[in-house]
Amino acid sequence: MTQRFKQLETAAQGTREATRDLLDAARWNDAGLIPAIAQQHDSGEVLMMAWMNRAALEETLATGRVCYWSRSRGKPWRKGESSGQVQQLVTAHLDCDGDTLLLGVDQQGPACHTGRRSCFYVALGADTAHVDSAPLVDPHELYGER
């Protein structure tokens, strides 16, 4: 944990910091990325986890449209760019250690590339796991043939 986040542990509600300074103090991984959890702002439903670099986060904060960093493509991934399933930013929070983001979003349609609302659809039990939701949309309709 950086000193800046250590100081925030005892900060009074309403304390203000420059976003730039907090992003400087955030704990980005060796690839310059930070995990970002997307949560539906009004229901609390956890939709997905993706990665952001600083440029993607700054774009998201500036435009209100969520942009992640695609590790597989090595470029910005503006959510909904190819599928139309856009995420609009409502809130953004850094956790107490400055190493994870929580994005409150307004998700239009499914968040998952499988066509499901959430990427978290495989429920684990001690002995068995099961799929607990069906796709809302056929992925081929979202993206065409892959």
UniProtKB/Swiss-Prot annotation:
UniProt KW keywords: Amino-acid biosynthesis, Cytoplasm, Histidine biosynthesis, Hydrolase, Magnesium, Metal-binding, Zinc
A molecular-function term among this protein's GO annotations: phosphoribosyl-AMP cyclohydrolase activity
Cellular component GO terms held in the UniProt record: cytoplasm
**Please, one GO biological process term?**
L-histidine biosynthetic process
Q: Where in the cell is it found?
A: Cytoplasm
Please list the residues that bind Mg(2+): 95, 97, 99
Q: Which reaction does it catalyse?
A: 1-(5-phospho-beta-D-ribosyl)-5'-AMP + H2O = 1-(5-phospho-beta-D-ribosyl)-5-[(5-phospho-beta-D-ribosylamino)methylideneamino]imidazole-4-carboxamide
Write down how the cofactor binds this protein. Answer: Binds 1 Mg(2+) ion per subunit.
In which residues is Zn(2+) bound? 96, 112, 119
Q: Which cofactor does it need?
A: Mg(2+); Zn(2+)
Q: Name one Pfam family in it.
A: PRA-CH
**Main location group:** cytoplasm
Task: Give the pathway annotation.
Answer: Amino-acid biosynthesis; L-histidine biosynthesis; L-histidine from 5-phospho-alpha-D-ribose 1-diphosphate: step 3/9
EC class of the enzyme, as a word: hydrolase
InterPro entries hit by this protein: PRA-CH (IPR026660), PRib_AMP_CycHydrolase_dom (IPR002496), PRib_AMP_CycHydrolase_sf (IPR038019)
In terms of superkingdom, the source organism counts as: Bacteria
Q: What is its EC number?
A: 3.5.4.19
| Similarity remark | Belongs to the PRA-CH family.
Entry function:
Catalyzes the hydrolysis of the adenine ring of phosphoribosyl-AMP.
Q: How does it assemble?
A: Homodimer.
Known PANTHER family for this protein? Answer: HISTIDINE BIOSYNTHESIS BIFUNCTIONAL PROTEIN, HISTIDINE BIOSYNTHESIS BIFUNCTIONAL PROTEIN HIS7
Q: What's the protein called, per UniProt?
A: Phosphoribosyl-AMP cyclohydrolase
Q: Which organism is it from?
A: Chromohalobacter salexigens (strain ATCC BAA-138 / DSM 3043 / CIP 106854 / NCIMB 13768 / 1H11)
What gene is it encoded by? hisI
